Amino acid sequence: MSARDPVGEGESPISGSPLREAIGRVGHALGLDAVGVADAVPTERTAFVREWWARGFGGEMGYLGRRLEERVDPRRVLPEARSMIVVGLACAPSYAPSQGLDAADSDERAPSRGRIARYAGGDDYHEVLLDRVRALEASLSHLAQRPVQARSYVDTGPILERAAAERAGLGWIGKNSCLIHPELGSHLMLGVILCDLVLPREAGVADHCGTCRACLDVCPTDAFPEPYVLDATRCLSYTTIELRGAIPEPLREAQGDHVFGCDLCQTVCPWNRSRPRTPLADPLGLR
């Protein structure tokens, strides 16, 4: 195995746990920080997702509702799917607080600077992660020594990435509705490979939010009607990115200097303290 050829030549056919371990090794060789496996069955969060959409919490993101049944059952996306390989890349540009780009680390921001979400300051994470996910997908047939039917997604298809990651043992979905990895925190970009390989499922990770309310209390627009439930129509990430019309007047004062997204509910999370990051390239010169 090498960086140029993470699979290696001449490896014998494998399946089950050895195949799962080989997939993990290839994923890490490609620069992925987390690799997990879940079975491709309807999510346990089906009822939650349907209720969330019915309550109008998805706002104008009609694409979520149009393919809702596919989102809750990966076999509707790829009928041959037996497993989901879920990967994560812990990446966030390390902005100096004085530059005004870090969501909540300092009150010493430059007065003329607006806040943008951490993930948006560098290269498009879709491209950065998708290249690695597709490389991992391309290795599957070689590892399994047979043609493998697979499809890869990085926030680009009808996949519930966080639910899949939770099922794959990458972490738990916290009170801020983000996936929290016990070692990497929640600034984790997720990718999913649906495939027809039968792989052992990972053990789940217990919810470690406990009695903490930091993410709920810091939200300037009260976007959490209850723990673990996000009303996207009140979230600054929605109103500054997804919403095509004017920002609702009741939310304008709370928006403050947020111009593209919001990280507050992640920045205050104890699980994000001193977590490793893979810096994205910075073509915009924001650092």
Predicted regions located by residue number:
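Short alpha-helical interface patches
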Residues: 156-163, 232-240
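SIR2/sirtuin NAD+-dependent deacylase catalytic core
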Residues: 211
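Glycine-rich phosphate/pyrophosphate-binding loop
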Residues: 287
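A short, flexible beta-alpha/helix-coil linker loop
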Residues: 200, 241-242
